[in-house]
Amino acid sequence: MAIREIIEVPDPRLKQVSVPVEKFDDELKTLVEDMFETMYDAPGIGLAAIQVGVPLRVLVIDLQPDDPDAEPVACDHDGHHHHHQPTKKEPRVFINPEILDPSEEYSVYQEGCLSVPEIYAEVERPATIRARWQDLDGKVHEEQMEGLMATCLQHEMDHLEGVLFIDHLSRLKRNMALKKLEKLRKAA
């Protein structure tokens, strides 16, 4: 397993349309292992293969990226002090994913992206989706998804079409986000 470099805007590869996976082999398994390691290291909750420079229709998602062996996390807010139990990892792999049935009802989540670091914006997407995908063995799965999982899968699937979350923003908001990113890079 290896941590791969995450490509960032304005890298033109991020605008590339990814191609379907046809070979479910050891090379694919290695890619997926590397993607999880890269995503956890970043840290993030989702990663598309194109974000590590591989134009294949492969996504990894884990909405529970915390280390299960970690000590409870101390938290202070609203004058209260308490501890959170760390959550367990739930790694999921989506190969050649498709959205079959997006709802007409929409929800808004604040999104960020490992390829657009330090930038966050509210994006509106279908609240529920029916998704179909293949696993590492090529077996087909189908599932109804909602909430953060539906949003995250749609965000990652956008990468497969060369679309970034900032592309869903108005031109003004997108330009402001890109200027902010440029400033952050100059300051670093």
Curated annotation (Swiss-Prot):
SUPFAM superfamilies: Peptide deformylase (SSF56420)
Active site per database record: 156
Main EC class the enzyme belongs to: hydrolase
Biological process per Gene Ontology, one example term: translation
Highest taxon above the source species: Bacteria
InterPro entries for this protein: Peptide_deformylase (IPR023635), Peptide_deformylase_sf (IPR036821)
Positions annotated to bind Fe cation: 113, 155, 159
Cofactor note as given: Binds 1 Fe(2+) ion.
UniProt cofactor(s): Fe(2+)
Stretches the record annotates as Disordered: 70-90
Pfam families: Pep_deformylase
Transmembrane segments: none
UniProt keyword annotations, A-Z: Hydrolase, Iron, Metal-binding, Protein biosynthesis
EC annotation from Swiss-Prot or TrEMBL: 3.5.1.88
GO molecular function: metal ion binding; peptide deformylase activity
Catalytic activity: N-terminal N-formyl-L-methionyl-[peptide] + H2O = N-terminal L-methionyl-[peptide] + formate
Role summary: Removes the formyl group from the N-terminal Met of newly synthesized proteins. Requires at least a dipeptide for an efficient rate of reaction. N-terminal L-methionine is a prerequisite for activity but the enzyme has broad specificity at other positions.
Family: Belongs to the polypeptide deformylase family.
Protein name according to UniProt: Peptide deformylase
Organism in which the protein naturally occurs: Novosphingobium aromaticivorans (strain ATCC 700278 / DSM 12444 / CCUG 56034 / CIP 105152 / NBRC 16084 / F199)
Species classification: Bacteria, Pseudomonadati, Pseudomonadota, Alphaproteobacteria, Sphingomonadales
The gene coding this protein: def
